Regions:
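Loop/turn-to-beta-strand initiation segments
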Residues: 91-93, 116-123
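Short basic (Lys/Arg) and small-residue
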Residues: 144
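Conserved P-loop
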Residues: 2-88, 128-139, 149-152, 173-174, ...
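Conserved catalytic/switch belt of AAA+ P-loop NTPases
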Residues: 110-115
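Conserved ATPase-coupling elements of RecA-like P-loop NTPase cores
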Residues: 99-109, 129-134
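Walker B catalytic acidic pair
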Residues: 98, 124
C-alpha cells in the first residue's frame, strides 16, 4: 500500500523539478523529515546541496542538526541569492532548513530552481509564536507541489500540537514581542490550540453561540 506522498512522488518523477514543503510547529520533526529525505537521496547517488540560514546557529554553524542530533553538512547563507554560489547545473536536489528566516526573494529563487529541473525540499515554521502565518510561508506552501504539515505533542495535555509557545522568564510571550528569536527547548514549547497562550493577543472575533 503506497502513501499519497509516494504516489505523488512517482508521478512527479516523470517530470524533473518540483517543490516540497515540510512545515509545522517547533518539535514536530521538520528537520528530521528533511534529513530523512536527503539521506534517501544520498543513497540514490543524487547530487545534493543543503542550506540553512546563518541566523540559525543553535546546534552547529556548518550543519543542519535536528533536535534528536541527526545532522548533515550544509552551507550557511545570509541572503537568499547566496544559494547560487553553490547550486550548479549538475545539482539534482536543493534542500533548505528553517527557510522562514530567509528573505522573501527565496520564493522566486526556488521557483526558478524547480523550473530548471531541481527537486527543492524545504522545511520551516508555518506560524510564528503568536500562531499567525510566518512571513512568506503561506505563499510558499501555495506554490509547492507537495506540502507535508507535521504536528508535535502538546507539553501540557498531550494533544496534537500545531503551535509554538514562546516562554519568557517562565511566562507566555506578549503579542507585540519580536517575531524572530532563535531558541530551543528553554525558550519554546509545542502546544495545542487550547493550551497555547499569548499575552495581549487581540481577539479577531467575538461570537455568541447558543
Amino acid at each position: 500500500m503506497y502513501t499519497i506522498y509516494e504516489v505523488i512522488h512517482v508521478v512527479l518523477k516523470q517530470k524533473e523539478g518540483w517543490i516540497e514543503v515540510i512545515c509545522g510547529p517547533m518539535f514536530a520533526g521538520k528537520t528530521e523529515e528533511l534529513l530523512r529525505r536527503v539521506k534517501r537521496l544520498e543513497y540514490a547517488k543524487a547530487n545534493i546541496v543543503v542550506f540553512k540560514p546563518a541566523l540559525d546557529d543553535r546546534y552547529a554553524t556548518s550543519e543542519v542538526v535536528s533536535h534528536n542530533q541527526n545532522r548533515t553538512e550544509s552551507y550557511n547563507i545570509h541572503e537568499s541569492h547566496d544559494v547560487f554560489k553553490y547550486v550548479k547545473k549538475d545539482t539534482d536536489v536543493v534542500a533548505i532548513d528553517e527557510i522562514q528566516f530567509l528573505d522573501e526573494s527565496i520564493l522566486e529563487i526556488i521557483e526558478y530552481l524547480a523550473d530548471e529541473g531541481k527537486r527543492v525540499i524545504v522545511s520551516g515554521l508555518d506560524t510564528d509564536f503568536r500562531a499567525e502565518p510566518f512571513s512568506f510561508m503561506p505563499k510558499l506552501m501555495a506554490k509547492a507541489e507537495i506540502v507535508t504539515k507535521l504536528t508535535a505533542v502538546c507539553v501540557k495535555c498531550g494533544a496534537p500540537a500545531t503551535r509554538t509557545q514562546r516562554i519568557v522568564d517562565g511566562k507566555p510571550a506578549k503579542y507585540l514581542d519580536p517575531i524572530v528569536l532563535i531558541g530551543a527547548s528553554e525558550s519554546y514549547e509545542a502546544r495545542c490550540r487550547h493550551c497555547h497562550k499569548v499575552y495581549r493577543k487581540p481577539k479577531p472575533y467575538q461570537g455568541n453561540l447558543r
